[in-house]
Amino acid sequence: LVDIAEAIINKRIESNEKKDDDLLGILLQMRDQISNEHIRDEVLTLILSGHETTANVMSWAFSYLAKNPQVRKQLEDEADNATWIKEGRTPTYLELEESSKVASAILQETMRLAPPVWVAPRIATTDCTIDGVKIPKGAHVLVSQYVTHRNPRFFPEPEKWQPDRWLDSNFEKSLPRGAYFPFGGGSRKCLGEYFALAEARLILLMVAKNFRLSGKFPKAQPRATYRPKGEVKNKVSLR
């Protein structure tokens, strides 16, 4: 990944292309203020946090939809009724939010069962005791979204993919803090949460408006992210 990031940067530098309409172009204009290593790390962050995580969520979401035609039909109906799609224009954030209740529920349930970040490392900043377990200052603690999101105390039939649970406005309010945290929590919660959700909702609705996907449900291959094993092959047909 480091090699990929450095190749992207070097290619842009060698092209002598002056761009200020993307992040890399802006960073390269600041080379007298920040190091090449800093720029490389920013590119790595974009690759890991802004690309792979969202791509994994979309792969799982379309795979679940292929297995659940009733939910797919709900999404298609929502896409058909979206005014901004009918008018062929880009929605405002508020329009997107108001016209994507089903799409949002699909994403929330997908991230519950297949959270792109499935385990979150933290370091204890002070001695503490959690549920009777003593944790010394400096200890490395791993908190797993994958495990927590399957707690039957909070999610009835936890192994079933049921987006409808999120359409109940009281459901998410009833969850205690920390029961559902696909984007982490606290002061280090993912800064890209709202952008990622908007991007994913747009993709779901635009695909559902025009296409229908079907294919074999993939096996999981948890690595740095919770990803499908190998290629996710789907048959794509026009609606």
Model-assigned labels for residue ranges:
Residues 8, 62, 145, 200, ...:
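Hydrophobic, repeat-rich solenoid/adaptor surfaces of innate immune receptors and signaling proteins
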Residues 49, 89-94, 119, 131, ...:
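Cytochrome P450 heme-thiolate "Cys pocket" and heme-binding signature region
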Residues 53-78, 193-210:
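Cytochrome P450 catalytic-core helices
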Residues 80-84, 189-239:
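Cytochrome P450 proximal C-terminal region
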Residues 25, 143-172:
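Conserved cytochrome P450 K-helix/beta-meander segment immediately N-terminal to the heme-binding cysteine loop
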Residues 1-58, 72, 88, 100:
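Conserved cytochrome P450 catalytic core segment spanning the I/J/K helices
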Residues 3, 56, 101-105, 178-181, ...:
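A structural signal for well-ordered alpha-helical segments within the folded catalytic domains
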Residues 17-26, 64-117, 131-139, 156-162, ...:
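Cytochrome P450 I-helix active-site segment
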